[in-house]
A protein has these predicted regions:
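Cleavable N-terminal targeting peptides that direct proteins into the secretory/outer-membrane pathway or into
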Residues: 1-33
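Outer-membrane beta-barrel proteins
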Residues: 2-3, 30-31, 91, 103, ...
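Acidic, small-polar-rich N-terminal luminal/periplasmic segments of exported/outer-membrane proteins
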Residues: 35-176
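Short acidic, glycine/serine/threonine-rich loops at helix termini
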Residues: 48-52, 220-221, 257-260
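Short sequence motifs at beta-strands and strand-loop junctions characteristic
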Residues: 73, 106, 184-187, 222-226, ...
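Outer-membrane beta-barrel translocator/receptor signature
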Residues: 141-144, 155-232, 236-244
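Acidic/polar loop-and-plug regions of large Gram-negative outer-membrane beta-barrel proteins
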Residues: 214-218, 231-237, 241-302, 306-321
């Protein structure tokens, strides 16, 4: 150590007791008690009470936790569907940025694009895991949730498009009495009822009935219409191990279809085109009629705590006129 630094060292040693004396009252002070922080969580069984869902059946052969599913799955719960007042699938899927409209004109059935790939009307749409005809606007009044599997889905649906699969889960028997009446700024009138319950000597039979009528008032001129819907879900707990479930739903809709604009080689959008005008409208033309019937049944037997077997069948029919 050089001679020039020795006075500074001695000065530092003299200040050390003073620093310890100043710090000693702080060390002797009472510890500070912080307020407790409460962290509340919920189980997967309770997660369907809001917009979050913890389980889905579209990712495999049975319902499974989303955390344990090695796939990208979006689940839209009953609460979300109800709060959005969704009546079409497009009202639900707009919450997912990976989904776009493939061809979804007013008054016709919708088709969608997932991650840039169009869904196939033959096998990309399902109810309770069973394939349905995709050329229909499936009603949402009797749906518990809508599940979207994004990506390859050959394991779930065989030959399918790489975009994914959309699965509707129907409501099951529950003690419920509900009536919904609504309207909007266009003068649309909507009425729906939801009734269900259990009955029998051992409460082994369950029913869920949904009815709806809608007077459609479109923002497009001359594109009004109407829709009627009815569904029935039946549950039979044959024994502690055996369960039978049956579902049937019918819908009839009439509305003029609104064709889109095509540029046909042009590079600029037309300035006088109005989205409220129905192209090619004739007062003698008839609206597009779509009549759909979807039925499915499932028998399930629990062999033991680890093994379960099921047998299911379905039928879907759509008539477009």
């Amino acid at each position: 150590m050089s001679a020039s630094n020795r006075p500074a060292v001695r000065y530092a040693w003299h200040l050390l007791p003073l620093g310890m004396a100043v710090a000693s009252p702080l060390l002797a002070a009472e510890p500070i008690s912080l307020e407790a922080v409460n962290v509340n969580g919920f189980s997967e069984q309770d997660s369907t009470s809001d917009y979050r869902a913890g389980r889905a059946s579209v990712g495999g052969f049975e319902q499974a936790s989303l955390l344990d599913t090695p796939a990208s799955v979006s689940v839209f719960t009953e609460a979300l569907i109800k709060d959005r007042q969704a009546k079409l699938l497009s009202d639900v899927l707009r919450n997912d940025a990976s989904v776009g409209d493939g061809y979804a004109p007013v008054g016709y059935y919708e088709n969608f694009v997932v991650r840039g790939f169009s869904l196939n009307a033959a096998n990309s749409y399902r109810i309770n895991g069973r394939s349905i005809a995709g050329e229909q606007n499936v009603a949402l009044e009797n749906k518990q949730q809508v599940e979207l599997l994004k990506g390859l889905s050959g394991l779930q649906s065989g030959v399918s498009e790489p975009g994914g699969v959309i699965n509707y889960q129907t409501k099951r028997a529950q003690d419920v009495r509900s009536v919904t009446v609504s309207t909007n700024e266009h003068g649309e009138r909507y009425f729906a009822t939801d009734v269900g319950g259990w009955f029998g000597s051992e409460q082994q039979f369950g029913l869920r009935v949904n009815l709806a009528h809608e007077d459609i008032r479109s923002y497009v001129q001359h594109a009004d219409g109407q829709r009627d819907f009815a569904s029935l879900a039946f549950d039979w707990n044959i024994s502690e191990r055996a369960l039978l479930q049956l579902d049937v739903e019918y819908q009839n809709k009439e509305q003029r279809s609104v064709p889109g604009y095509q540029l046909l080689g042009g590079t600029t959008l037309p300035h006088d085109a109005s989205p409220r005008k129905l192209l090619g409208y004739q007062n003698w033309s008839s609206p597009v009629g779509m009549e759909s019937l979807n039925m499915n049944g499932r028998f399930e037997y629990q062999f033991n705590d680890s093994w379960k077997g099921s047998l299911s069948a379905s039928r879907s029919r759509v008539v477009i006129d």
